[in-house]
Amino acid sequence: MTRSPIRRLVFGTLRRLLYLWVRSETINQSSFTLDLDRSRPVFYVLQNPSLTDLAVVDTECTKAGLPRPVLPVSVGNLLEPAAFFYLTPEPDWLGRQDKRGAPPTLTRLVSALTQNAAEDAQIIPVSVFWGQSPDSESSPWKLLFADSWAVTGRLRRLLSIMILGRKTRVQFSAPINLRELIEHNKGHERTVRMAQRILRVHFRNLKAAVIGPDISHRRNLVKGLLNQPLVKQAILDEAEREKISPEKAKAQALRYGNEIASDYTYTAIRFLEVVLSWFWNKIYDGIKVNHLEGVQKIAQGHEVIYVPCHRSHIDYLLLSYLLFRNGLTPPHIAAGINLNMPVIGGLLRRGGAFFMRRTFKGNPLYTSVFNEYLHTLFTKGFPVEYFVEGGRSRTGRMLQPKTGMLAITLRSFLRSSRMPIVFVPVYIGYERVLEGRTYLGELRGASKKKESIFDIFKVIGALKQRFGQVAVNFGEPIKLAEFLDQEQPDWRTQELGPQYRPAWLNETTNRLGERVAQHLNEAAAINPVNLVALALLSTTRLALDDRAMARVLDLYLALLRRVPYSPHTTLPEGDGRALIQHVKDMDLLAEQSDALGKILYLDEQNAVLMTYYRNNVLHIFALPALLASFFQSSSRMSREQILRYTRALYPYLQSELFIRWPLDELDAVVDQWLEAFVEQGLLRFEKDLYQRPAPSSRHFVLLTLLSKSIAQTLQRFYMAISLLLNSGQNSISAEELEDLCTVMAQRLSILHGLNAPEFFDKSLFRHFIQTLLDQGVLRRDEAGKLSYHEALGELAEGAAKRVLPAEIRLSIRQVALHRSEDAADQLAAPAQND
């Protein structure tokens, strides 16, 4: 581009003609704008010469109010006719191209800045993507039409514009400060080469992040798995074990590979984008995305593994859609084989899903093929997504991590750590989950149903409901190498053996699962439904008058702003009354008026369903609710007393709810909450004692409601300890105690009308008992029977007096004392039927 009026006229005409058909958008304009210093000259750099790319960039700069690349720009005494250059020099009139040469504009810029130390310039790498698809070496359609790793000629670019021009995306990267490079004092030529090298690496990493790394066709990829040493050995072992020929075993391995592998196609991604755009707009009031900028930065140069929480079947569709819309490659998604249904399974496979069986036990050949497939994806740098919870959470809580996929990932990384792996937690928060009706039945005790293609019609039938908003929060990434450095500092130098199964693998994988779960909870998106559910489920009759309800919600918001749970946690907009109106509009909250005002309440169906939404945020309120519980039975406590009982109970709450604070940070966090309580009038601090308000006061009612949030969890803890103590030393196993707790919790829920199915969730008791063992409170003898410290009873009763009302403690002790006959009958029944 020169200052020639004729050339400017030709370029302007080309741009107008191009945009008769082309539609473009900028992927990350907002984050880019924040990094730009408008006081310094700006130059844009494109990777390869292309007049159409330049026209698109010029259009996007004009739309955003940024300096245009085709206008002159001055740097000191240097006047450049245009503010752009190509990293790869333009060919001469014979089509010859000297790739070793440096862009003349870059050379002149370095000279000008070297001669004038007061001047500076910003270089902004810009990429234009005509479509967004990974390469497939045997797919001429993609090679012709979609942006890939193939070199694009004029004919192919013309076809790309015709076919994919209406889906053109521009990515501006963070500016490179040329002055900073010059200050390294490397000399003119070396500075130019350094700038070129930085730009080449940048473009390569960005292209991998946006369109995906170079990957071979599915058929060749699957066949290639069979040539890997570990799979070859597994085939020979299978042939020997099953008494079949190696050829038959190899054919079986090939069938496994085809069953597993995705068939990632750009056509399917675009089809899903169109369908899902309609779907989201049809049922949701909006999708809020938070903290995506960090992912866009870290995606370049890393193998990204997205680890979302799992609340709905649409989780993976939503995440892939958002990543694609924001210029990142949709991941390959681990899906259960139960989703490989007719029609739906094929579409999911083409959208990036690869299918896995629920269990690998007893099938080493399948295990080997699956592990090798994942290793191939990881080492090629292709993004992957899987759910550490395994299945969808039916209770709204974060489920205990299933560590199988994490272990496979860790072993793959130990085998080859060339591509650094980073886990990106993704919290997906729904105001109304799509499968709510199904979960309602399961929350009431119905068994889990197998997925069917006909389930799609149930979803269509639910589209008339209001589903509110969805929030997608990207949490703090976890770099696997840094995690291993903390857990196993010498992991790089250890001899790991051919299967890459070090002795510390299981324990380290478990801790990695806990870390992922904690980071997921840190990224929680708190919404109006969560807070309304938390408030009303803490009342005796599931009802509050509207003014009291607004006060409770305002209190919760004030506390969360005063003591933020995490930098990645988000809060709803508006005050208590706005939140109430929002939930009423979604038909989740009933209202009744009388002479004194309005009563807000939950009907029977919503009362059960709202436990799901309360549980989404229970981990955030667990610690303040525990502190509030101390003042239900005690009118005053010292800081030392509060800390002592908090330290005693916190490990069990932390383990169950994946609360973020380690024990050595607990005291400081407790102090923050106590200060917030005093500021809000929930406590008074006088004469070195924290004192509760008068029982008849409004503030005491608020303190009591807050304490009820965690009451059922504390009751479960006390019940398990009471049953253990009643059984005596070395008389009951962990499994027997777990079954006994479940039976007794069901009875207690009937006696007290508890409408919370997780109260008698067997897995929660199992985890609590395991935590007692991990903490050294319990021990197993040679027969597997449990023993406990002699002071356990006194300690448990002392803590219970602080957090549970006397009538609840009495009821639990009575149930524990009279459990023998009925519990024995119920536990014996299954054994007699076997």
UniProtKB/Swiss-Prot annotation:
Biochemical pathway: Phospholipid metabolism; CDP-diacylglycerol biosynthesis; CDP-diacylglycerol from sn-glycerol 3-phosphate: step 1/3
Class of enzymatic activity (EC top level): transferase
Coiled-coil spans in chain: none
Keywords, comma-separated and alphabetical: Acyltransferase, Cell inner membrane, Cell membrane, Lipid biosynthesis, Lipid metabolism, Membrane, Phospholipid biosynthesis, Phospholipid metabolism, Transferase
Pfam families tied to this protein: Acyltransferase (PF01553), GPAT_C (PF19277)
Keyword match Transferase: yes
Subcellular location: Cell inner membrane
Membrane topology: Peripheral membrane protein
GO CC annotations, alphabetized: plasma membrane
Principal place of residence: membrane
Enzyme Commission number(s) of this protein: 2.3.1.15
PANTHER family, per database record: DIHYDROXYACETONE PHOSPHATE ACYLTRANSFERASE (PTHR12563:SF17), GLYCEROL-3-PHOSPHATE ACYLTRANSFERASE (PTHR12563)
UniProt domain comment: The HXXXXD motif is essential for acyltransferase activity and may constitute the binding site for the phosphate moiety of the glycerol-3-phosphate.
NCBIfam families to which the protein is assigned, alphabetical: plsB, PRK04974.1
Protein name, entry field: Glycerol-3-phosphate acyltransferase
Organism: Pseudomonas fluorescens (strain ATCC BAA-477 / NRRL B-23932 / Pf-5)
